Amino acid sequence: MTGKKAVVILSGGLDSTTCMGVGKEAGYELYPISFHYGQRHDREIENAKKVASYFNVTEHKVFSLEFLKEIGGSSLTDQSMEVSQEGVGEDVPNTYVPGRNTIFLSIAASYAEAIGAEKIYVGVSAVDYSGYPDCRPEFIEAMQQTIYQGTNANPAMTIEAPLIDLSKGDTVKLGMKLNVPYHLTTSCYLGGEEACGECDSCRLRLQGFEEAGATDPIKYM
């Protein structure tokens, strides 16, 4: 281990787990963080813990952000709304959680500064999530500038979004090359013991494995 530290925003899903593999390959000591924010698919936290254990991390923090449920405005935090199954398009889907990635990256930056980490890994993909405003390169660049201006980190920490230009198929190929434990992950928005296979997240995941010529190791209904 080189002594270099990196914070990884870890949801327990395919993308963030791939980022764990990327960070490990780059020689970083990984410090994953996960979030309870009243999401209907909070099962993902248990998956995140399994992934963190697989990578034998020094510490895995889970932060509570229940106020995001109080804010509402998303089918992921409001049980009265149905999860969108319309597919990824130009419109913002109702699974978008207002301000979520802004808050996640702000907390990640605070934690990274406190522990002296030089990298923050986040698994956003502008290609697959074209409808999510906080998955665009412009957003990541803006948050990078915010971190430069608003922290006392020395050296300045940088946000790494290694999947930003990758399709889901390319992401799966990368993860397989890095021996990422996809069998420990979950992507389903409904949060059941078995993935639904119908929500946008499940469909993108299945499409990714198909494009990669591989079989998804998790169970579907």
From Swiss-Prot:
Q: Which Pfam families match?
A: QueC
Q: Which residues bind Zn(2+)?
A: C188, C196, C199, C202
What does the record give as EC number?
6.3.4.20
Q: Is Nucleotide-binding tagged as a keyword?
A: yes
A GO molecular function assigned to this protein is:
ATP binding
The reply to whether 4Fe-4S figures as a keyword in the UniProt entry is: no
SUPFAM superfamilies noted in UniProt: Adenine nucleotide alpha hydrolases-like
Cofactor list: Zn(2+)
Q: Which InterPro entries match?
A: QueC (IPR018317), Rossmann-like_a/b/a_fold (IPR014729)
Indicate what this protein is called per its UniProt record. 7-cyano-7-deazaguanine synthase
